[in-house]
Amino acid sequence: MSKKGRSKGDKPEAETDSVQMANEELRAKLTNIQIEFQQEKSKVGKLRERLQEAKLEREQEQRRHTAYISELKAKLHEEKTKELQALREALIRQHEQEAARTAKIKEGELQRLQATLNVLRDGAADKVKTALLADAREEARRTFDGERQRLQQEILELKAARKQAEEALSNCMQADKAKAADLRAAYQAHQDEVHRIKRECERDIRRLMDEIKGKERVILALEKELGVQTGQTQRLLLQKEALDEQLVQVKEAERHHSSPKRELPPGIGDMAELMGGQDQHMDERDVRRFQLKIAELNSVIRKLEDRNTLLADERNELLKRSRETEVQLKPLVEKNKRMNKKNEELLHSIQRMEEKLKSLTRENVEMKEKLSAQASLKRHTSLNDLSLTRDEQEIEFLRLQVLEQQHVIDDLSLERERLLRSKRHRGKSLKPPKKHVVETFFGFDEESVDSETLSETSYNTDRTDRTPATPEEDLDETTTREEADLRFCQLTREYQALQRAYALLQEQVGGTLDAEREARTREQLQADLLRCQAKIEDLEKLLVEKGQDAAWVEEKQVLMRTNQDLLEKIYRLEMEENQLKSEMQDAKDQNELLEFRVLELEVRDSICCKLSNGADILFEPKLKFM
């Protein structure tokens, strides 16, 4: 027994020793883990310091790059401003040279025209006068014949065009009428369909409402009847309860008093027996009658409830049908609205077409009147009706010729002004609105120049703003220039011939004309001469400036090419800047990935080292730390 007690006492001691040894081992491992944890904390702090240093270096590099980019932009801006200043000065010098050259050309032409005018005023011999008169008449006749043929050809072309326009207009009107008739028919059919559907729906709704009202009246009547019957049943029940109480009282009285006949008088006993028998018989009949009435009333109530449920079902069905009809009518209503809108649009389009037709007819009438007026004027001013005996008619005809030429010149000037305005407006819309640049670019002051030079300079600027884009535009410009030259030469020749013919006629007529009339005609012709000279100078300026357009266009193309090169250079620099930014961002991302990879490798190395040493318990705290 003692040995067994000893063995039992040794076992707890061995267990406690093993537990203490295990605790000591665990404490040693815990201290090692804490030491390693402190080492890892120090490593993490070092890595954070490295990260801060890398961020500082990256920020410094970014600042250096931004400073370099700003320096490049400043240099580029300075170079651009210098180039623009040099180009502006060169253009100003060139414009001044061109202005001086045009002034010299104008002075030479003015002197030449003055010399020719003096020669014409001095006069010549009679033979020369007659020859000039014959030449003038022949040339005027030829020009008149050519103009008449041209006008006749134009009249034929206008008639053909008018005929085509009238045919197209009639076709359009017929098509519009047919389309309008179709639309009206479709609209009418649609309206009829809508009205029919509305009438049917209203009729169905009225019928259903009448049925609902009739059923509601029936329900109210049945409810009233039910109320009356319930009142009667309640009254009968009350009577029955009263009779039951009387019967109970009579039975109690009979039970308590065994001989009621002795106590009561004989007459009273007989009456009580008779009353008791009658009351019992009446109670039985009343009970049967009440039971029958109650059964009838219950059956009536069941029928009314069934009918009420049927009416409720019918009402729900009618409501459902009304909702379905509303849902079906909704697209029809929307379609009706759309058709109404389309009809309004078609009416507006028909009104516009009618207005266009009225305007076309009005233009046609005006064109007819104009053609008839021109034909009458040409008939009145025909050169075939002239004769040497009618000097006044000759003078009037020449005056009409001068007026016609004046109208032609005025039309040309109006066309030129219109082109100037349109091109000026186009130039204003195309060019940046920098007023000082325009003034320094052309060297003009707004207060010192007159309207003629201002219009000419604006015309020049607007023409120079237009760069020739295609060979077709160049061909159009050359053709318009040749036509302007030919028209200018023809006008000058006709004007000189008319002046010579008018002078010869004045000499032939002599004193037959009135002095005041002659003075008026002379003043008018002088004014016409001055105005024509001004128009001739304007046309000469235009021709000279048209000749100078080529050089200006080339210079402008060079300027545009330089601007395009500068813009491409700026675009390349911006692309390089964006590329550098993207590279910096990629480097930053790569650096962060490398830092994260370093942390992973360090943690993995520490875990591998601990596992190789045999410390299996360290795996759980390492995972918690991660």
Curated annotation (Swiss-Prot):
GO CC annotations, alphabetized: cytoplasm; membrane; microtubule; microtubule cytoskeleton; ribonucleoprotein complex
Region (Disordered): 1-25, 452-481
Gene symbol of the encoding locus: Jakmip1
Name of the molecule in the record: Janus kinase and microtubule-interacting protein 1
Keywords: Coiled coil, Cytoplasm, Cytoskeleton, Membrane, Microtubule, Phosphoprotein, Protein transport, Transport
Localization, UniProt: Cytoplasm, Cytoskeleton; Membrane
Subunit structure: Homodimer. Interacts with JAK1 and TYK2. Forms a complex with GABBR1 and KIF5B/kinesin-1.
Region listing for Mediates interaction with TYK2 and GABBR1, in residue ranges: 365-626
Major localization class: cytoplasm
UniProt function note: Associates with microtubules and may play a role in the microtubule-dependent transport of the GABA-B receptor. May play a role in JAK1 signaling and regulate microtubule cytoskeleton rearrangements.
GO molecular function, one term: RNA binding
Modified residues (Phosphothreonine): T470
Region of interest (Mediates association with microtubules), residue spans: 1-365
Family indicated by similarity: Belongs to the JAKMIP family.
Organism classification: Eukaryota, Metazoa, Chordata, Craniata, Vertebrata
Post-translational modification: Phosphorylated.
Membrane protein topology class: Peripheral membrane protein
Ranges annotated as biased composition (Polar residues): 452-461
A Gene Ontology biological process term: protein transport
Coiled-coil segments: 13-255, 284-413, 490-604
Organism: Mus musculus
Modification sites for Phosphoserine: S382
